[in-house]
Amino acid sequence: MTTTPDWIMIGGDGPESYNQQSSYQRALLEATKDKMTKAISANLDLDLISNRFIVADFGCASGPNTFVAVQNIIDAVEEKYRRETGQNPADNIEFQVLFNDFSLNDFNTLFQTLPPGRRYFSAGVPGSFFERVLPKESFHIGVMSYAFHFTSKIPKGIMDRDSPLWNKDMQCTGFNPAVKKAYLDQYSIDTKILLDARAEELVPGGLMLLLGSCLRDGVKMSETPKGTVMDFIGESLSDLAKQGVTEQEKVDTFRTSIYFAEQGEIRQIIEENGKFTIEAFEDIIHAKNEFPFDPKTLAISFKAFYGAFISAHFGVEVMRKAFELVEVKAREQISRLHNSKPGMQYLIVLRKN
């Protein structure tokens, strides 16, 4: 499969970087710590814990959230080992963490900010998580945090004006059934390939932990806070085209390879794939709620996540102007955000069959 890493986060450690502007994602990791610990305690076979234990993060970005995720996992494994054997895990287990993301990811910042005093060895694994990136049966627990909503490409026909699948919006809003089906079909194909790859790489009985956002069944993307801000981004780019700051053709050819599936769609895809058993599908109560409805915070947060691939298509200056307009639109239409329907934050625990 050929994949284009359009969604690389803004690297470095500057004020607009993902490293500095991902507190929302980190809050989900903190909210799920106890549930992750219980899930690992209940589902991890102690026989898998030998003198070397491998944890892999797929879609690690540049930190610091990946460090929180893998440390939560290591803490849970050590707690289970200590409780069930009465032994000190530090005497018997060496942990290794594999950090995976596309080769364009800012691995330099990732490794420069590794936590001091960490109790694990670390290695970077560049490559698309839609494909095999590790040897067979080579890791014990994997995690994907806010990376389970990507597709490998834009569905065919979405950007063709002569196609019934023509979508004028930069995202799948959910209001056009044919467009939604095209995105869902592409997401299903990619997710099943991803699950197949992880199933080959996991040891028998190993676990995958998926954390992220999805839609509640029956809710459309543009009805949610996240979808509303995405609409603001698209509207801002269109405004800049009308002002002559960028070309309308560029706006017409810009789409996100992202699909936030409904909860039931995710469950169906995993079950149809058959490589994993769903041990838990938890609805997480996020400490920051769905989003902080502060216009400036919203603009900065979405810039950290989407800014890099908007820059790749339009240039840095257009990207910055677009997010200035996003802040204005969020302020002017704050009631639209307050009246939106909540999305869902989840923790999914999968055991390899």
Curated annotation (Swiss-Prot):
Please give the SUPFAM superfamilies that the UniProt record associates with this protein. Answer: S-adenosyl-L-methionine-dependent methyltransferases
Task: Summarize where S-adenosyl-L-methionine binds, as residue positions.
Answer: 18, 59-60, 65, 99-102, 128-130, 145-147
Q: Highest taxon of the source? A: Eukaryota
Residues noted as binding substrate in the record, renumbered to the chain = 18, 21-25, 146-150, 301, 306
EC number(s) for this protein?
Answer: 2.1.1.-
| A Pfam family recorded for this sequence | Methyltransf_7
Q: How is the cofactor bound?
A: Binds 1 Mg(2+) ion per subunit.
- Can you tell me which residues bind Mg(2+)? 167, 252, 254
Q: What induces it?
A: Induced in the presence of the herbivory P.xylostella larvae. Silenced by miR163. Down-regulated during seedling deetiolation and seed germination via light-induced silencing mediated by miR163. Accumulates in etiolated seedlings. Induced by the fungal elicitor alamethicin. Slightly up-regulated by P.syringae. Induced by exogenous salicylic acid (SA).
Q: Which GO terms describe its biological process?
A: defense response to bacterium; methylation; miRNA-mediated post-transcriptional gene silencing; regulation of root development; regulation of seed germination; regulation of seedling development; response to bacterium; response to herbivore
Q: Name one GO molecular function term.
A: methyltransferase activity
Cofactor(s) the record lists: Mg(2+)
The alphabetized UniProt keywords are: Developmental protein, Magnesium, Metal-binding, Methyltransferase, S-adenosyl-L-methionine, Transferase
- Function recorded in the entry: Methyltransferase that may methylate 1,7-paraxanthine. Prevents seed germination and modulates root architecture during early seedlings development. Plays a minor role in defense responses toward pathogenic bacteria (e.g. P.syringae).
Q: Which PANTHER family does this entry report, sorted A to Z?
A: S-ADENOSYL-L-METHIONINE:CARBOXYL METHYLTRANSFERASE FAMILY PROTEIN (PTHR31009)
By sequence similarity, the record places it as follows: Belongs to the methyltransferase superfamily. SABATH family.
Subunit relationships: Homodimer.
Q: What is this protein called?
A: Paraxanthine methyltransferase 1
Q: What is the lineage of its organism?
A: Eukaryota, Viridiplantae, Streptophyta, Embryophyta, Tracheophyta
